[in-house]
Amino acid sequence: MNGAGRGSLWRVLLCGALVAVAALPAYAAGSEVADAASKGDRTSVRSLIQRKADVNAPQVDGTTALHWATRADDLDLADMLIAAGANVSAANREGVTPLGLAAMNGSAPMLQKLLKAGADPNAPLDQFKDTALMMASRTGKTDAMRVLLEAGAQPNIAETWGGTTALMWAASERHPEAVKVLIDAGAEVNARSKFVAAANGRGFEGRSPKADASDQKPEDFASGWLTPLMFAAREGDVESARMLVAAGAEVNALAGDAKNALGLAIFNGNYEVASYLIDAKANVNQADTQRFTPLYWAVDRRNMETAPNFPWVVTADPLPLIKKMLDAGADPNALVQNTPRARMREGSPRIVFATPLMRAAFAGDIELTKLLLSHGADPKIISNDGETMLEAACGLAFIQGYHRGRPAAERLEVVKLFVELGVDVNQADDYGITALMAAANMGDTKMIQYLVDKGANLAAYDLGKKNDGAFGASVEPLMPVDYAIGVGTFVPNNAVIIHEDAVALMARVMKERGITHTTSECTLRGFTCAQARVDPKVASPAEILRARKLAIGHQIEGVTGGLEAK
């Protein structure tokens, strides 16, 4: 959560505290004025004042009558209390003052009254030293902001938790009018928020941001270190982005994870502001600390997965933006050699993506694949684990229901394209996995038949012990048909997906070609060797499949070492 986001939390906690106090059955002794003010009862407040009741006597949580008047934006009640000596700087036990409430409401008239009565426009509102100007900027109420600025509010004060300024708060809430007011008041357009050493550290690991420093360098998986322009790009605020750039904002400044504003915009699905930033000469080849470029993220977002931990799904098509980046010089062969960290958190065993082309191939996206190839993308680049573009197109490690891909017919067109471009159908990765094994794991019979017709080897073996026994892996080398049976699975929790039509097709062709299925029954049936009823040396794959389904249903436990069939 950044400093600007914490402002929303501040509001929720504050309002919750006030409502909770309102619901209490009894109040602190002597808090009659505050009690009456909480109900908006001006008549009772006036009567109590006439009887010399203490207008500053707080309720149990420190809330005074003026707090309630300000929260309700009751100007007449506030006048009455201030005239009777109400303390305009009183803070409740959370540190909330009437000025903070007025700023949160964006009430210019109330702010004027409080400031005229002596409230300090720069007084910290809580333990993190948020200011009234930050609160007003978050609401986007420019008249309230002007009142504070005219009273001496400083636009470049940074709160102490995330190091954010009022300009960042305005940009993060998509308030271009507020952004303009602050720029005109001298707000620093290249100010930086604090630096967080581990991505999501604040929200998930409880780590506080670091104090910023002029020589701070990005670290792996870091976050923070954002400028106002980055906040605008992240939230998709084109108008604010234009004003910030015109005021001197650095277009190619780098965030804590080394993304520039363009990368942040695309990562968050904000393609309009991304297009503007390209026009503003943003570096289209700026790689972040995970080595992903803006082009990669745009390709990725076109075929974004859906899962519980993804808070949004981009509906706009980034294809026009991808074309614009390529025309602006984006390198389609920039090596990524990485797996997006979000997929790591989801537990996906996704292959390492080498380039944007491999990501497009994995999705089976023929239009995007052709576009990248037309701009010089190399179809023969392999990942640092040896995976080929063809393996990716065949769905290596694709998980149905998790990954998002194109229809089978379109995926097959991508497969054919790579074969026609000369990618070897039998080229194996560092685990010995081939394109045919990937296709068998997908269960796509048309793809399997095409690859077999093009010479894919049904008698090939992987290297065994793939993924160190993770995801249902076997210590015994597996054949392509085993991937259709479900032994060579890439699904988390070892969930088995059996493709019977694919097994039948591959078994038939293997029989026609005299290829023996040699995988042991122990491997095929996973920890059920003592109950063996099928001889793997004479049984067909289909017979073994039926026995295996009978023995273990649709769940296999990963074999972890050296078991022999008894």
Positions of the model-derived regions?
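Bacterial N-terminal signal peptides that target proteins for export
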Residues: 2-14
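Bacterial N-terminal signal peptides
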Residues: 12-23
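N-terminal segments that cap or nucleate solenoid repeat domains
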Residues: 27-68, 77
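Ankyrin-repeat boundary/"N-cap" motif
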Residues: 29-35, 58-64, 91-97, 124-131, ...
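Ankyrin repeat A-helix N-terminal signature
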Residues: 35-39, 68-74, 101-107, 135-141, ...
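Conserved ankyrin/ankyrin-like repeat signature
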Residues: 44, 76-77, 109-110, 143-144, ...
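Ankyrin repeat domain, specifically the short helix-to-loop turn at the C-terminus of the second helix
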Residues: 49-54, 79-87, 112-120, 146-154, ...
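Terminal, low-structured helical/coil segments at or just beyond the last alpha-helical repeat
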Residues: 490-566
